[in-house]
């Protein structure tokens, strides 16, 4: 679809479900993203926030939806939408989603969803898209794909003044994002696409959010893609609670080995964000801190049972940082460094998950954090 065609479709949707709609609101939109709200009755929270990522290959590939909620019923709705490949159209997906949410909260079907079956009005919001020949259309689409980022930069900001998705990101990190985009396009052209569109788009969003984050910019942690893979990250925890024994250990480690961080490996599967990343400690060897054999982490957050597709990767990183300190993690100086490896970490992780699935997870008293 051409940029002007996608823009017309988004404006059409926003004209139906504006920011004052009684049931479903499109709060803001860009060519690659929708920010929406669904209004639900008490006792549920009054506003349910949903996000939709629109891929460059839309409508050949389906938009990706996720929700800011831990409710498994909501996750189930989005998983069913993801599993349904019958229609990639934003309009039809939006209709299905609104109807399912109304059904979930025992609300009557809203009449406005029927408007989504209508064809796009000619010249919607001043947009005219006359195609005089197939050749012209193909030429336009090729230019749109090549220069998509430039069109996005020129796109009118929504009413709420939302800034460019690259706002607040340093030049060196923008270069990394651009390198990934080019690599993905080349892989697509070569028919050698790795991962899934859903996971790749979400991981790109997570990476952009991290690059904008103050925690990242102030050096609490850093992120590096392994072999430029969007699905394999090295995360360095560079700052922990200065009053913790772990902080003191890291100072000693710096003097002895020149290492002043905890290195984590995050690996993501094709079905991310519906499944959690697999996270393990690479170095140094730690005791305590809920670190298992091989470097795996004993955290319900990192299991299917405790995971939510709404969780951001930065929140996971910060939670791991806090959990290591809370669990009184200590550096094991002189330990065999080869004891931490992927195979052993996966084995430890699978064993602990089976135990907790059978016996449940321990929830510490509130005074313990």
UniProtKB/Swiss-Prot annotation:
Which GO MF terms are attached to this record?
A: ATP binding; ubiquitin conjugating enzyme activity; ubiquitin-protein transferase activity
* Organism the protein comes from: Oryctolagus cuniculus (Rabbit)
Is Amino-acid biosynthesis given among the entry's keywords? no
Which pathway is this protein engaged in?
Protein modification; protein ubiquitination
Induction, per UniProt? Up-regulated in pregnant endometrium during implantation.
Superkingdom is Eukaryota
Q: What is its EC number?
A: 2.3.2.23
Reaction catalyzed: S-ubiquitinyl-[E1 ubiquitin-activating enzyme]-L-cysteine + [E2 ubiquitin-conjugating enzyme]-L-cysteine = [E1 ubiquitin-activating enzyme]-L-cysteine + S-ubiquitinyl-[E2 ubiquitin-conjugating enzyme]-L-cysteine
Whichever gene encodes this chain, its name is: UBE2Q2
Ranges for domain UBC core come to 198-362
Protein name listed in UniProt:
Ubiquitin-conjugating enzyme E2 Q2
Tissue specificity, per the record, is: Detected at embryo implantation sites in the luminal epithelium of pregnant endometrium. Detected at low levels in ovary and liver.
| Main location as per UniProt | cytoplasm
Task: Enumerate the active-site residues.
Answer: 298 (glycyl thioester intermediate)
Q: Where is the composition biased (Acidic residues)?
A: 131-143
Q: Which family is annotated? A: Belongs to the ubiquitin-conjugating enzyme family.
